[in-house]
């Protein structure tokens, strides 16, 4: 977020780190990206997640640990956002749960937070989804307003 004028006129409202899922650790996860960490001022989480979703082409929650606030964002995306595509990821076969798509190993993805919280109903959680967007409208608007600092 830029305040004032000049190259040093920047106020950081938060940051989000996205990293590719690791097939060895997380499973194939449809070759998606996951949240690696975030620090966000109150109210800016969804905006930063929008940016991360647009820049990665598809994003999941952290595969091992998610805060309650972040879970609420993922649930909102999966149930209420008409501008996103929600893709259900499957649970790996080593969880001893029935898989949703046992013939497709490409969507197998670690479901630690969803499974820890919801057990056999893990698939109903927004934490079990991959979120995609078409295009980069939020990023484009932030760039046009010189409000996005990318590193």
Cite the ranges covered by each PLM segment.
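A conserved beta-strand-loop-helix scaffold within acyl/acetyltransferase catalytic domains
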Residues: 1-39
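Compositionally biased, intrinsically disordered low-complexity regions enriched in proline and serine
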Residues: 2, 45, 50, 96, ...
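Terminal substrate-recognition subdomain of acyl/acetyltransferases
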Residues: 16-24, 57-151
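Conserved acetyl-CoA-binding loop-helix of GNAT-fold acetyltransferases
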Residues: 35-55
């Amino acid at each position: 977020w830029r305040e004032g004028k000049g190259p040093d006129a920047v106020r950081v409202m938060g940051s989000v780190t996205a990293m590719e899922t690791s097939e060895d650790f997380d499973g194939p996860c449809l070759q998606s990206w996951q949240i690696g960490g975030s620090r966000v001022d109150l109210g800016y989480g969804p905006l930063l997640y929008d940016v991360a979703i647009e820049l990665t082409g598809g994003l999941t929650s952290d595969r091992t640990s998610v805060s309650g606030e972040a879970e609420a964002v993922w649930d909102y995306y999966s149930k209420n956002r008409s501008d996103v595509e929600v893709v259900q990821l499957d649970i790996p076969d080593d969880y001893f749960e029935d898989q949703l798509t046992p013939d497709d190993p490409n969507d197998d993805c670690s479901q630690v937070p969803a499974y820890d919280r919801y057990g056999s109903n893990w698939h109903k959680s927004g934490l079990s989804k991959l979120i995609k967007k078409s295009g980069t409208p939020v990023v484009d608007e932030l760039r046009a307003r010189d409000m996005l600092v990318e590193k």
